[in-house]
């Protein structure tokens, strides 16, 4: 409990946490503000029939906003899609590659391009959803009160504005709050919907659609998956590093042994989020286009189908390696070690050290990619088999646990920086000082 008590003793940290909760509360309020021109009851009936389909999976990332067609119906996924496109383009477009190497000014420019891309993608998805809703249901089952271009344009602009506001909200959380704002928005949407998912599971048991044995089995599965995620997310490959002794006057500096910690999952929760975004973008549009071929295409990409899971695994593996290459540069690490007199025993400083770190990183990234694929795919298939909500699937659990651990680590960094105990005491030697 002392770790939580210490939070209140640091005004800046306390302010950041309050700011984070306040901004997330704004997001959750916005999820309940409906887009005008929609029959809420007809839309609810539509999503009741769509449980277990791609729409249900998309709604999980939208925090329930799509089910209500709220102003935040698109969620933060258009921003993530734009981020993916920009990060891929920085590899192949020389101008963007130069910008990415220009420090803070270059990053600000790329962020601005990402915002423009978010607006474009939001407009496309918003228009597709508006057209699709007009086609879903006729007469008494009509979802839209007054179909036509006025509704399409108004809905497109409303949903685009909602996503743009969420993008700004996420940036504010990252800058003025605690944790990664975009990840926390997805995290809060999933967590906020879990009580409803539990209630839905209970109603299935009451209706005889699911027995208690299956509920107990799913509960055990969730517990095992969470434990496994925590273990893997905190696992490291430690490379020993030795620093050479330096004699300055009568003093001896250096000579200590330490290690270079490489996380098993360096990319964090980014790969499954990026993979989901890529699959959902075309599939969501197809789901709302009233043609038989498009409906078949959308059905093929429904979570649990072979095509979806193969694509999902492929994208997860790709983004594990791609994002790790972005956030961790072996050349920079090797140069810094050489600069300060550090070396890996048995490995020559400089290029050889960089190559060695890259080999180790590639091996553990492959293990991390297999782990994420296993966690995201296998539980989802089992849960689909028993018709349980997506909020109990591997992707949702990985995001909740991963983002939670990352946020706790950031809080601990603030505490340790100011000589206080962290939230999790690692040993008796780590006691803080007031």
Task: Explain the meaning of each model-derived region.
Residues 1-100, 105-434:
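N-terminal cationic and glycine-rich segments that engage phosphates or anionic surfaces
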């Amino acid at each position: 409990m002392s770790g939580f008590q210490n939070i209140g003793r640091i005004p800046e940290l306390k302010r950041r946490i309050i700011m984070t909760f306040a901004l997330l509360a704004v997001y959750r309020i916005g999820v309940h503000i409906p887009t005008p021109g929609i029959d809420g009851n007809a839309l609810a009936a539509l999503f009741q029939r769509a449980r277990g389909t791609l729409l249900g999976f998309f709604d999980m990332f939208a925090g329930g906003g799509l089910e209500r067609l709220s102003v935040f119906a698109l969620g933060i996924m258009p921003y993530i899609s734009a981020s993916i496109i920009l990060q891929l383009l920085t590899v192949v477009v020389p101008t963007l590659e130069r910008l990415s190497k220009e420090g803070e000014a270059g990053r600000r420019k790329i962020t601005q391009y990402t915002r423009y891309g978010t607006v474009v993608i939001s407009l496309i998805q918003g228009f597709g959803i508006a057209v699709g809703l007009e086609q879903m249901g006729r007469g008494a089952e009509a979802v839209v009160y007054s179909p036509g271009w006025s509704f399409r344009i108004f809905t497109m602009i409303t949903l685009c504005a909602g996503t743009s506001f969420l993008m700004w909200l996420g940036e504010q959380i990252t800058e003025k709050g605690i944790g990664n704002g975009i990840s926390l928005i997805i995290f809060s949407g999933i967590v906020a919907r879990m009580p409803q998912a539990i209630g839905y599971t209970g109603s299935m048991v009451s209706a005889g659609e699911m027995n208690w044995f299956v509920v107990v089995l799913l509960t055990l599965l969730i517990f095992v998956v969470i434990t496994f995620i925590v273990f893997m997310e905190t696992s490291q490959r430690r490379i020993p590093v030795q620093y050479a002794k330096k004699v300055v006057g009568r003093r001896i500096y250096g000579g200590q042994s330490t290690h270079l910690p490489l996380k098993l999952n360096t990319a964090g929760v980014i790969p499954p989020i990026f993979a989901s975004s890529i699959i959902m973008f075309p599939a969501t549009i197809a789901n709302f286009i009233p043609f038989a071929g498009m409906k078949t295409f959308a059905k093929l990409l429904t979570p649990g189908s072979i095509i979806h899971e193969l694509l999902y695994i492929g994208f997860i593996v790709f983004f594990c390696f791609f994002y790790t290459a972005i956030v961790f540069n072996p050349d920079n690490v090797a140069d810094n070690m050489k600069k300060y007199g550090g070396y890996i025993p048995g490995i020559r400083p400089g290029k050889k050290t960089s190559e060695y770190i890259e080999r180790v990183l590639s091996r553990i990234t492959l293990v991390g990619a297999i782990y994420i694929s296993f966690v995201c795919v296998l539980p989802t298939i089992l849960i689909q088999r028993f018709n349980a909500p997506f909020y109990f699937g591997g992707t949702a659990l990985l995001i909740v646990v991963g983002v939670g651990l990352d946020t706790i680590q950031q809080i601990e960094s603030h505490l340790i920086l100011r000589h206080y105990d962290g939230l999790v005491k690692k040993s008796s030697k780590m006691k803080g000082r007031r």
